[in-house]
Swiss-Prot record:
Keywords attached to this entry: Cell inner membrane, Cell membrane, Ion transport, Membrane, NAD, Sodium, Sodium transport, Translocase, Transmembrane, Transmembrane helix, Transport, Ubiquinone
Lineage start: Bacteria, Pseudomonadati, Pseudomonadota, Gammaproteobacteria, Aeromonadales
Catalytic reaction equation(s): a ubiquinone + n Na(+)(in) + NADH + H(+) = a ubiquinol + n Na(+)(out) + NAD(+)
GO cellular component, one term: plasma membrane
E.C. designation(s): 7.2.1.1
GO biological process annotation, one example: sodium ion transport
Primary location group: membrane
Transmembrane segments: 42-62, 72-92, 103-123, 131-151, 178-198
GO molecular function, one term: oxidoreductase activity, acting on NAD(P)H, quinone or similar compound as acceptor
Record InterPro entries: NqrD, NqrDE/RnfAE
Pfam families found in the cross-reference section: Rnf-Nqr
Main enzyme class: translocase
Protein name: Na(+)-translocating NADH-quinone reductase subunit D
Subunit structure: Composed of six subunits; NqrA, NqrB, NqrC, NqrD, NqrE and NqrF.
Length: 210
């Protein structure tokens, strides 16, 4: 059983110290596609966190029964099943956002963060720590996603969660939205700045030269 300090470490380290996007550079593709609005980024964060946490939990529970030769297939089967459940829940209760996310919910199965934590952590750890590790990595992923979405939506649309923050010229205000920030490549630059900021703040995270 994990103690409180270990639980705290499992939850916070992926957010602050070992972020899956900022440090490990995993899960970048979805960060380009779903961060033009806060609503889609928030729902994607919840979806990835749920899949990562519960896939870690279930894989940890059956880890001793999985033959080593088929462990990847077993992990993929668990992850795919959870992705289907999440996709159907979104279609049932958040249909409009589900349409905006399109295929990207289904593509969670290919997200390196989910598969990476299942293989690197859940296959070697007890269920509760594995579940917390999944939540922590989902939150770390979401922290970057929501930061990128905040910048893109405010500067690209003048809104945040659909609420107008900057008065638009179309409505008699002063702000002219920067449409470039609504294009997927803008997320690359913002993520690059986040990575630069994180590694400048903590030089230990800079990759060693060959």
């Amino acid at each position: 059983m994990a103690d409180k300090s270990e639980m705290k470490k499992l939850l916070l380290t992926p957010v602050l110290g070992n972020n899956p996007i900022a440090l490990q550079v995993l899960g970048v593709c979805s960060a380009l596609a779903v961060t033009s609005q806060m609503k889609t980024a928030f729902v994607m964060t919840l979806a990835v966190t749920a899949v990562t946490a519960f896939s870690n939990l279930f894989i940890s529970l059956i880890r001793n029964q999985i033959p080593n030769s088929v462990r990847i297939i077993a992990q993929m089967a668990v992850i795919a099943s959870l992705v289907i459940v999440v996709d159907q829940v979104l279609k049932a209760y958040a249909y409009e956002i589900s349409k905006q996310l399109s295929v990207f919910v289904g593509l969670i199965i290919t997200n390196c963060i989910v598969m990476g934590r299942a293989e690197a952590y859940a296959m070697k750890s007890a269920p509760l720590p594995s579940f917390l590790d999944g939540i922590g990595n989902g939150l770390g992923y979401g922290a970057v996603l929501l930061t990128v979405a905040t910048v893109r939506e405010i500067l690209g649309s003048g809104t945040w969660f659909g609420i107008e923050l900057l008065p638009l010229v179309n409505n008699g205000g002063w702000y002219v939205p920067n449409g470039l920030l609504l294009l997927p490549p803008s997320a690359f630059f913002i993520i690059g700045l986040i990575i630069w900021g994180v590694r400048t703040r903590d030089p230990k995270q800079v990759e060693a030269k060959d």
